[in-house]
């Protein structure tokens, strides 16, 4: 299914119906859920903290097939990331692989029923203000996600792009049983290599794409993350790609040449990066499909158009 084409209501309803509960979480994640549940109990939005997480059965089955063939993957090169904007590009809804480098690769496409681009933008403004808000997104995995320039993020005189791009979120979250502390530096699509003309022609409604680094080495980007969202009839699609590790094309980002040695020092060899790719694929599938299940209702209760 093309990432930027028009989807019919039939496409969306078929995909939305085939949801299944996701029930396996590592022991540290189960313990985190109980702590998060206690912390959110007295918040006005506590009813949106939900234990059941449902994901598309088709996405689960694709991940169960094991790593993708390399010919079906994309690299973080400028040429490859711009393929996401081509009218005939087909984006599968889930998958992972280990690329030469080594580099972990994750791909996904998620449908948000009844969601608009405005709702999705609002979420990125609203949730960093409190850790408890962040836990709604993935109750078993999310710890906190404060924003470095919070005052700018909340400045209603600025556009969404002015508030987010050039800003950094400091995420603490479990990916599998590994607690990760990450700096997520949101950037203009063009700064990451996405072609401005293609982006406009694709009629993308927004991007929350970023470079990621380990919190204790913020000067070394170890990951490129691309999230492009587009409204369709009855909802919104989010097309995502994650690259974590070393690749020659990452050299366009200052400091990335140190990523390979830094990751190796932190215990990320080829086997660990392949495991990370799998765990990130599961994490992405769970968190965004879970967000899709409650975001329209949350926005109607707490959202403001200015955000």
From Swiss-Prot:
Ligand binding (Zn(2+)): 142, 173, 283, 287
InterPro entries per UniProt: DAPG_hydrolase
Induction: Expression is induced by the GacS/GacA two-component system and repressed by the pathway-specific regulators PhlF and PhlH. Expression is not influenced by the substrate DAPG or the degradation product MAPG.
Entry cofactors: Zn(2+)
Reaction catalysed by this enzyme: 2,4-diacetylphloroglucinol + H2O = 2-acetylphloroglucinol + acetate
Activity vs pH: Activity is slightly enhanced at pH 6.6 and pH 6.0. Retains only 10% of its maximal activity at pH 7.6 and is inactive at pH 8.0.
Tagged with keyword Hydrolase: yes
EC class name: hydrolase
Activity modulation comment: Activity is strongly reduced by pyoluteorin, an antifungal compound produced by the bacterium.
EC number(s) per entry: 3.7.1.24
Pfam families reported for this sequence: DAPG_hydrolase
The keyword Iron is annotated on this UniProt entry: no
Domain of life: Bacteria
GO molecular function terms noted in the UniProt entry: hydrolase activity; metal ion binding
Entry keyword set: Hydrolase, Metal-binding, Zinc
Phenotype upon loss of function: The phlA-phlG double mutant cannot degrade DAPG.
Family: Belongs to the DAPG/phloretin hydrolase family.
Protein role: Hydrolase that specifically degrades the potent antimicrobial compound 2,4-diacetylphloroglucinol (DAPG) to equimolar amounts of mildly toxic monoacetylphloroglucinol (MAPG) and acetate. Does not degrade other compounds with structures similar to DAPG, such as MAPG and triacetylphloroglucinol, suggesting strict substrate specificity. Degradation of DAPG to MAPG may provide an additional means of fine-tuning levels of this antibiotic or may help avoid accumulation of a metabolite that at high levels may become toxic to the producing bacterium.
Protein name per Swiss-Prot or TrEMBL: 2,4-diacetylphloroglucinol hydrolase
Organism (species): Pseudomonas protegens (strain DSM 19095 / LMG 27888 / CFBP 6595 / CHA0)
Gene expressing this chain: phlG
